[in-house]
Every structure is written in C-alpha cells, then in structure tokens.
Amino acid sequence: MISITHDRPLGDINTFRMQVSCCLFIEYDRATDLKDLDFENIPKPVKHIGSGSNLLFTGNFKGTILHSKMDFIEKLSDNLFSVGAGVGFDRFSEFAAREGLWGSENLSLIPGEVGAAAVQNIGAYGVEV
C-alpha cells in the first residue's frame, strides 16, 4: 500500500527533530509499490530515507521523500533471512540473537533501519554491516 502526503512535517522522522516539511512524502510497504509511482511528475529531488538518524534538515525539503514501511523478518533457512528495509537494527539484532546467530549483537541500539545498509556504513564496537 502507498500513502502519499503533501506538505508533511518531518520532525517525527529525523533524530534531530528539526521542524521542517517536504513537498511530498510517500510511504510504501512493498517494493513493488514503487513501480506504480509516476516519478516523472513528482517534485524533485527525490530522497529515500530510513529513520532519519543521519539527516540534518536545515530548511524545508522542496522535493519528495520516500520512506519504506517494509517491516518484516522472514527466515529462509538456518542462516539466511529476508529482512524488510524498514526493520530497525535493534530489532534485527535481537532477532538474530534469538536465532543463535552471533555477530550482530553489537548492532543493537544503533538508530537506523536495515535498508540503510545498502548505501552507508553501519557498525559499532568493531562490527560493520
């Protein structure tokens, strides 16, 4: 499902709690939802964000914000999982520990979501994703 909001305040989705807004805010809960969007006719630039832990807005964002609500963890085999981009690292770390998978425990309490791992370094205490 896609949710589209115009002129949405962003204070609740950035860790600095900056009271700014964006022209268009789109949340989705399936990756296939994105192919249904008309990217030619939405305000530019387009930014894809997670929990906003690495964002500092200094003013209103004149473009479109995409935000994943894909919040699932699926066990595919003993050591293979499918994890939604919107799953928080703390939740994933707790899940992995319950499953007996070692190594992700140092990711607990890291602000951010799993989807960020594709584009930035995420780690603490000598453990990196």
What are these regions (language model features)?
Residues 2-129:
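Anion-binding (especially nucleotide phosphate/pyrophosphate-binding) glycine-rich loop
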